[in-house]
Amino acid sequence: MAKEFSRTQRVAQEMQKEIAIIIQREVKDPRIGMATVSGVEVSRDLAYAKVFVTFLNDNEPEQVKTALKALQDASGFIRTLVGKAMRLRVVPALTFSYDNSLVEGMRMSNLVTNVVRNDTERRSVTGEDQED
């Protein structure tokens, strides 16, 4: 019977849960604020993990940069706690990256909404002109 998920995918899912809990409960750095772990990619040999995060108030790029620096500084602490929680022989080295897919998704949604609104307004204006 074939496995539905590979070991790296299972480790990545579990790491995402654990890192989210650790950032929320254990990391006390005020520079981080409200961080959400949106995904984790683990290398095949489980030596490296890229952690994608978003922040609640990520309007300013400087705040995002500061928060990422704080997370990277705390990566050793987070890695230790992940190792204890997951009981892995090799705990991946953590690298934190900003995940802008949520912001890009909202931007694209706004663009589509504006285009639909403009199209509707254009149709209503041209429809009124044809009736007269």
From Swiss-Prot:
Record key words, sorted: Cytoplasm, Ribosome biogenesis
What's a GO cellular component annotated to this UniProt protein?
Answer: cytosol
Q: Name one GO biological process term.
A: maturation of SSU-rRNA
Instruction: Name the source's superkingdom.
Output: Bacteria
Compartment(s) of residence: Cytoplasm
**Which GO molecular function entries does the Swiss-Prot or TrEMBL record give?**
ribosomal small subunit binding
Q: Which family does it belong to?
A: Belongs to the RbfA family.
Q: How does it assemble?
A: Monomer. Binds 30S ribosomal subunits, but not 50S ribosomal subunits or 70S ribosomes.
- Role: One of several proteins that assist in the late maturation steps of the functional core of the 30S ribosomal subunit. Associates with free 30S ribosomal subunits (but not with 30S subunits that are part of 70S ribosomes or polysomes). Required for efficient processing of 16S rRNA. May interact with the 5'-terminal helix region of 16S rRNA.
* Protein name stated in the entry: Ribosome-binding factor A
